[in-house]
Amino acid sequence: MEIKLIDKNGRPAKAGLAVSEATFGREFNEALVHQVVVAYQANARTATRAQLTRAEVSHTTKKPWNQKGTGRARAGMSSSTIWRGGGRAFPNTPDENFSHKINRKAYRAGVRSILSELVRQDRLSAVEEFAVDTPKTKQLVEKIKGLGYNEGLLVLVDKFDENLYLSARNLPHVLVLEAQYVDPVSLVRFPQVLATAGAVKKLEEMLA
């Protein structure tokens, strides 16, 4: 099978880029993609919240009022979990573990499913080469518009390009990634994906 290929001048090439059907021609598995995306986001999450237990809140052990005779409900101390300002029965802690386990084969299958759906929706294109001469954001914006793209673009390259990285760093809707660091969340989040021919080959090697 082939995917759309753009030459370095921004024009569609005469022939598309031949790709592996095993990587870019899979059926879309929505349940698996959901599992992969949720697991990736959960594994990137860090526990930053902390709440106080009954022992940790500021309190006194003095009984608020007598056990009997007042007509009010009995109360022991101000740190009770049902009191305003009291401790939490099951507090969140900074060492909370949010990680989700997902098998490597399932993860790769999920990424292949996403890539295949991007091809079907005509959201994934290949380009012969993608680079800028100097680290200038304006130059990159002009290059992206010259290729027919607007905001919301994920660029996959086969090797790190410092000029390209620095040029895209200040663009909130453009992300440049090396193919080896591609993740399911970025693939799903961006409306359009542009990959160099070298990046496509690297994806095929990684996901084979």
Swiss-Prot record:
Keywords: Ribonucleoprotein, Ribosomal protein, RNA-binding, rRNA-binding. The keyword Nucleotidyltransferase does not apply. GO terms for cellular component: ribonucleoprotein complex; ribosome. Residues 54-78 are annotated as: Disordered. Coiled coil: none annotated. It comes from the Bacteria. Pfam families: Ribosomal_L4. The keyword rRNA-binding applies. One of its GO terms (biological process) is translation. One of its GO terms (molecular function) is structural constituent of ribosome. InterPro entries: Ribosomal_uL4, Ribosomal_uL4-like, Ribosomal_uL4_dom_sf. One of the primary rRNA binding proteins, this protein initially binds near the 5'-end of the 23S rRNA. It is important during the early stages of 50S assembly. It makes multiple contacts with different domains of the 23S rRNA in the assembled 50S subunit and ribosome. Part of the 50S ribosomal subunit. This is Large ribosomal subunit protein uL4. It comes from Methylobacillus flagellatus (strain ATCC 51484 / DSM 6875 / VKM B-1610 / KT).
